[in-house]
Amino acid sequence: MRKSLRLIALASTAALLVAACGSAATPTQAPATEAPAATEAPATEAPATEAPASEGPAAPDPESLLGKILAAGKIRISTDPNYKPFSFLDDNQKYDGFDIKTAEEVAKRLGEMYDKPLEIEWMTPSWDLITSGKWGGRWDISIGSMSVTKTRAEVVDFADPYYYDFGGVAVPKDSTVTSLDELAGKRICVGSSTTYEQWLAGELEIIDPNMLKPPAGAEVTPLETDNLCVQAQASGRGFDAIAANANGINDWVKEGLPVKLLDIGPIFTVSVSFALDRSGPPTGEMLTALNKI
């Protein structure tokens, strides 16, 4: 049986998930008893019936987003070449990372579903352009770890979540800070137009009863990406903290950058989905196909 893409994604991001696993009791097997030999009935040959051929999905409306993608034989996917470990350029200047692998699998399965192989064209618009909608047909889909928020859902259509994201806070490696309260009024860097910027402003609208309260009166500095924040920190810019994806922060630590993850648990947990522009061609058939993958 083919595994759903969401199941694969969830397994691949196990470090991002909080799961409680209980051990089930092993059932006691009853002793085997030998059944009496069955009397074989005379064989009668049933007339052969041909199983109905399985049909693929109906051809989509040519004016829909899905119809246009299939007609072009190409899907244009927005990504960020500076968002390791989710999407980045490797040493050979090829795209790599969790979101890149996910996008490649989406294109493969979508093409197989309609028997039309799809080529990928990578697009690299800025994050604020992606999250603000009104893409003007410049790309077809965002597969770039976009968190689902009420504000974003007003301008983009979200498919079913493909994983769940934990927010975190990075502090300098030698910092003595142990709580968010100690960051009140401090300098905090954040990626522009991200859920972390919204969280610091007290404007993040997600369903998470355990979302932590942001530090009061923080002096927020938004840069184009949170990776630019940690690079600025490494070059001596001197932020007191960086609000970012917890998995990304752990990656910075592994790379030897001068930060550590503040040990306070997730600041919030949010679902992450593929996004389609609501102002573009109709997205209904594309959403249905994505949710079947």
Language model: regions and residue ranges:
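A ligand-binding cleft/hinge motif common to bilobed small-molecule-binding domains
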Residues: D128-L129, I143-V155, Q198-I207, Q231-T269
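Extracytoplasmic small-molecule ligand-binding "clamshell" domains
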Residues: A59-S64, L70-S142
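C-terminal motif of bacterial Sec signal peptides marking the signal peptidase cleavage site
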Residues: L17-A20
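Acidic, polar ligand-binding/catalytic clefts
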Residues: E104, D115-E182, G265-P266
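Extended ligand-binding regions for polar small-molecule ligands
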Residues: A59-E63, R109, D174-V177, D181-R187, ...
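Bilobed "Venus flytrap"/periplasmic-binding protein-like clamshell domains
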Residues: R76-P85, Y95-E112, M146-S147, Y164-T225, ...
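Periplasmic-binding protein-like
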Residues: P81, Y162-D174, A246, V253-I293
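Bacterial lipoprotein signal-peptidase II cleavage site
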Residues: G22-A30
